[in-house]
Protein backbone atom coordinates (compact mmCIF):
# COMPACT_ATOMS: atom_id res chain seq x y z
CA UNK A 1 0.00 0.00 0.00
CA UNK A 2 2.86 2.40 0.81
CA UNK A 3 4.31 1.64 -2.60
CA UNK A 4 0.99 2.53 -4.25
CA UNK A 5 0.82 5.82 -2.34
CA UNK A 6 4.35 6.65 -3.51
CA UNK A 7 3.46 5.76 -7.11
CA UNK A 8 0.34 7.92 -6.96
CA UNK A 9 2.30 10.85 -5.53
CA UNK A 10 5.01 10.48 -8.17
CA UNK A 11 2.50 10.11 -11.02
CA UNK A 12 0.63 13.29 -10.07
CA UNK A 13 3.86 15.26 -9.90
CA UNK A 14 5.03 13.80 -13.21
CA UNK A 15 1.69 14.50 -14.93
CA UNK A 16 1.72 18.09 -13.69
CA UNK A 17 5.35 18.62 -14.67
CA UNK A 18 4.93 17.06 -18.13
CA UNK A 19 1.69 18.84 -19.02
CA UNK A 20 2.93 22.33 -18.13
CA UNK A 21 6.32 21.56 -19.69
CA UNK A 22 4.62 20.72 -23.00
CA UNK A 23 3.23 24.26 -22.96
CA UNK A 24 6.66 25.79 -22.31
CA UNK A 25 6.95 25.94 -18.53
CA UNK A 26 10.72 25.82 -17.82
CA UNK A 27 10.68 24.43 -14.26
CA UNK A 28 12.38 21.02 -13.85
CA UNK A 29 10.64 18.09 -12.15
CA UNK A 30 12.53 18.67 -8.87
CA UNK A 31 11.16 22.24 -8.69
CA UNK A 32 7.65 21.04 -9.53
CA UNK A 33 7.78 18.53 -6.66
CA UNK A 34 9.05 21.27 -4.33
CA UNK A 35 6.21 23.65 -5.30
CA UNK A 36 3.60 20.91 -4.79
CA UNK A 37 5.08 19.97 -1.42
CA UNK A 38 5.68 23.45 0.02
CA UNK A 39 2.90 25.43 -1.74
CA UNK A 40 4.59 28.84 -1.36
CA UNK A 41 2.45 31.96 -0.89
CA UNK A 42 4.31 34.45 -3.07
CA UNK A 43 4.56 32.67 -6.39
CA UNK A 44 5.52 33.38 -9.97
CA UNK A 45 3.31 32.45 -12.92
CA UNK A 46 5.42 29.37 -13.64
CA UNK A 47 4.67 28.11 -10.12
CA UNK A 48 1.02 29.15 -10.34
CA UNK A 49 0.66 27.00 -13.47
CA UNK A 50 1.84 24.00 -11.49
CA UNK A 51 -0.49 24.53 -8.53
CA UNK A 52 -3.44 25.20 -10.84
CA UNK A 53 -2.85 22.08 -12.91
CA UNK A 54 -2.42 19.92 -9.84
CA UNK A 55 -5.63 21.30 -8.31
CA UNK A 56 -7.55 20.49 -11.50
CA UNK A 57 -5.98 17.02 -11.58
CA UNK A 58 -7.07 16.35 -7.99
CA UNK A 59 -10.61 17.64 -8.65
CA UNK A 60 -11.10 15.44 -11.69
CA UNK A 61 -9.50 12.42 -10.01
CA UNK A 62 -11.93 12.75 -7.11
CA UNK A 63 -14.92 12.97 -9.47
CA UNK A 64 -13.82 9.80 -11.27
CA UNK A 65 -13.24 7.92 -8.00
CA UNK A 66 -16.66 8.85 -6.60
CA UNK A 67 -18.49 8.14 -9.85
CA UNK A 68 -19.40 11.82 -10.10
CA UNK A 69 -17.65 12.56 -13.40
CA UNK A 70 -19.77 13.41 -16.42
CA UNK A 71 -18.47 15.24 -19.47
CA UNK A 72 -20.46 18.47 -19.86
CA UNK A 73 -19.78 21.93 -21.27
CA UNK A 74 -19.90 23.32 -17.73
CA UNK A 75 -17.28 20.86 -16.48
CA UNK A 76 -14.96 21.51 -19.43
CA UNK A 77 -15.18 25.26 -18.76
CA UNK A 78 -14.75 24.71 -15.01
CA UNK A 79 -11.52 22.75 -15.50
CA UNK A 80 -10.09 25.38 -17.85
CA UNK A 81 -10.99 28.00 -15.25
CA UNK A 82 -8.92 26.19 -12.63
CA UNK A 83 -6.02 25.64 -15.05
CA UNK A 84 -5.67 29.33 -16.00
CA UNK A 85 -6.80 30.89 -12.71
CA UNK A 86 -4.85 34.11 -12.02
CA UNK A 87 -2.85 33.61 -15.22
CA UNK A 88 -4.96 35.59 -17.70
CA UNK A 89 -5.64 39.32 -17.75
CA UNK A 90 -9.17 39.15 -19.17
CA UNK A 91 -11.68 37.55 -16.79
CA UNK A 92 -13.89 36.81 -19.81
CA UNK A 93 -11.32 34.24 -20.92
CA UNK A 94 -11.36 32.26 -17.66
CA UNK A 95 -13.83 29.39 -17.42
CA UNK A 96 -15.66 30.42 -20.59
CA UNK A 97 -15.55 29.43 -24.23
CA UNK A 98 -13.74 31.97 -26.35
CA UNK A 99 -15.56 34.80 -28.06
CA UNK A 100 -12.54 35.91 -30.08
CA UNK A 101 -10.52 34.39 -32.94
CA UNK A 102 -7.24 32.61 -32.26
CA UNK A 103 -4.35 31.48 -34.42
CA UNK A 104 -2.06 28.55 -33.73
CA UNK A 105 1.57 29.23 -34.52
CA UNK A 106 4.09 26.63 -35.56
CA UNK A 107 6.06 25.90 -32.34
CA UNK A 108 9.22 25.41 -34.40
CA UNK A 109 8.75 28.57 -36.50
CA UNK A 110 6.94 31.03 -34.28
CA UNK A 111 6.35 33.55 -37.09
CA UNK A 112 4.53 30.91 -39.14
CA UNK A 113 0.79 30.27 -38.72
CA UNK A 114 0.14 26.53 -38.50
CA UNK A 115 -3.62 26.40 -37.97
CA UNK A 116 -6.67 28.64 -38.02
CA UNK A 117 -9.27 27.10 -35.64
CA UNK A 118 -13.06 27.43 -36.07
CA UNK A 119 -14.77 30.82 -35.72
CA UNK A 120 -15.69 31.82 -32.17
CA UNK A 121 -19.40 31.93 -33.04
CA UNK A 122 -19.32 28.18 -33.73
CA UNK A 123 -17.58 27.07 -30.54
CA UNK A 124 -20.74 26.44 -28.50
CA UNK A 125 -22.27 24.33 -31.25
CA UNK A 126 -19.08 22.38 -31.97
CA UNK A 127 -18.43 21.65 -28.30
CA UNK A 128 -22.04 20.62 -27.72
CA UNK A 129 -21.75 18.15 -30.61
CA UNK A 130 -18.46 16.78 -29.27
CA UNK A 131 -19.83 16.30 -25.75
CA UNK A 132 -22.95 14.61 -27.12
CA UNK A 133 -20.87 12.31 -29.35
CA UNK A 134 -18.59 11.23 -26.50
CA UNK A 135 -21.40 10.63 -23.99
CA UNK A 136 -23.57 8.73 -26.47
CA UNK A 137 -20.69 6.42 -27.43
CA UNK A 138 -19.49 5.41 -23.97
CA UNK A 139 -19.68 1.62 -23.96
CA UNK A 140 -20.07 1.49 -27.73
CA UNK A 141 -16.64 2.67 -28.90
CA UNK A 142 -13.45 1.28 -27.36
CA UNK A 143 -12.64 3.60 -24.41
CA UNK A 144 -9.07 4.28 -25.56
CA UNK A 145 -10.24 5.21 -29.07
CA UNK A 146 -13.07 7.35 -27.66
CA UNK A 147 -10.66 9.24 -25.38
CA UNK A 148 -8.27 9.73 -28.30
CA UNK A 149 -11.08 11.13 -30.48
CA UNK A 150 -12.04 13.61 -27.75
CA UNK A 151 -8.41 14.65 -27.29
CA UNK A 152 -7.75 15.52 -30.92
CA UNK A 153 -11.17 17.04 -31.66
CA UNK A 154 -10.98 19.31 -28.62
CA UNK A 155 -7.53 20.48 -29.68
CA UNK A 156 -8.88 21.17 -33.19
CA UNK A 157 -11.89 23.14 -31.92
CA UNK A 158 -9.60 25.09 -29.56
CA UNK A 159 -12.53 26.30 -27.43
CA UNK A 160 -10.57 28.61 -25.12
CA UNK A 161 -8.22 31.55 -25.51
CA UNK A 162 -5.64 29.68 -23.42
CA UNK A 163 -5.33 26.43 -21.48
CA UNK A 164 -6.68 24.21 -24.26
CA UNK A 165 -3.91 21.60 -24.16
CA UNK A 166 -3.80 21.27 -20.38
CA UNK A 167 -7.60 21.08 -20.13
CA UNK A 168 -7.76 18.49 -22.91
CA UNK A 169 -5.13 16.25 -21.31
CA UNK A 170 -6.89 16.36 -17.93
CA UNK A 171 -10.27 15.46 -19.41
CA UNK A 172 -8.75 12.71 -21.56
CA UNK A 173 -7.37 11.02 -18.45
CA UNK A 174 -10.81 11.28 -16.83
CA UNK A 175 -12.54 9.74 -19.85
CA UNK A 176 -10.19 6.79 -19.64
CA UNK A 177 -10.89 6.58 -15.90
CA UNK A 178 -14.68 6.35 -16.15
CA UNK A 179 -14.31 3.66 -18.80
CA UNK A 180 -12.35 1.35 -16.53
CA UNK A 181 -8.83 2.58 -17.26
CA UNK A 182 -8.25 4.53 -14.06
CA UNK A 183 -4.75 5.85 -14.52
CA UNK A 184 -4.64 8.70 -12.02
CA UNK A 185 -2.95 6.69 -9.31
CA UNK A 186 0.13 5.47 -11.15
CA UNK A 187 0.03 6.70 -14.72
CA UNK A 188 1.15 9.80 -16.64
CA UNK A 189 0.57 9.67 -20.38
CA UNK A 190 1.55 13.35 -20.49
CA UNK A 191 5.06 12.08 -19.75
CA UNK A 192 5.10 10.21 -23.07
CA UNK A 193 4.11 13.35 -25.00
CA UNK A 194 6.66 15.46 -23.18
CA UNK A 195 9.51 13.19 -24.30
CA UNK A 196 8.98 14.43 -27.86
CA UNK A 197 6.80 17.54 -27.84
CA UNK A 198 7.24 18.22 -31.56
CA UNK A 199 5.97 14.75 -32.41
CA UNK A 200 2.99 15.20 -30.07
CA UNK A 201 2.06 18.53 -31.65
CA UNK A 202 2.39 17.08 -35.14
CA UNK A 203 0.21 14.08 -34.28
CA UNK A 204 -2.54 15.83 -32.34
CA UNK A 205 -2.59 19.06 -34.34
CA UNK A 206 -3.71 19.80 -37.87
CA UNK A 207 -2.33 22.32 -40.33
CA UNK A 208 -4.21 24.84 -42.43
CA UNK A 209 -7.59 26.58 -42.23
CA UNK A 210 -10.22 24.57 -40.32
CA UNK A 211 -12.89 25.29 -42.93
CA UNK A 212 -10.70 24.06 -45.77
CA UNK A 213 -9.59 20.81 -44.10
CA UNK A 214 -12.41 19.85 -41.69
CA UNK A 215 -13.90 17.18 -43.95
CA UNK A 216 -10.56 15.50 -44.59
CA UNK A 217 -9.07 15.23 -41.09
CA UNK A 218 -7.82 11.68 -40.43
CA UNK A 219 -7.67 10.50 -36.81
CA UNK A 220 -5.98 7.15 -37.52
CA UNK A 221 -2.35 8.25 -37.10
CA UNK A 222 -3.17 10.10 -33.88
CA UNK A 223 -5.11 7.15 -32.40
CA UNK A 224 -2.18 4.81 -33.09
CA UNK A 225 0.22 7.27 -31.44
CA UNK A 226 -2.18 7.69 -28.49
CA UNK A 227 -2.29 3.92 -27.95
CA UNK A 228 1.49 3.68 -28.22
CA UNK A 229 1.73 6.30 -25.47
CA UNK A 230 -0.43 4.30 -23.09
CA UNK A 231 1.57 1.14 -23.78
CA UNK A 232 4.87 2.98 -23.32
CA UNK A 233 3.75 4.42 -20.00
CA UNK A 234 2.52 1.04 -18.76
CA UNK A 235 5.96 -0.41 -19.54
CA UNK A 236 7.59 2.41 -17.55
CA UNK A 237 5.35 1.69 -14.56
CA UNK A 238 6.08 -2.03 -14.76
CA UNK A 239 9.77 -1.28 -14.25
CA UNK A 240 9.08 0.80 -11.13
CA UNK A 241 6.85 -1.72 -9.35
Which positions does each model-derived feature cover?
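FIC/Doc superfamily catalytic core
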Residues: 1-241
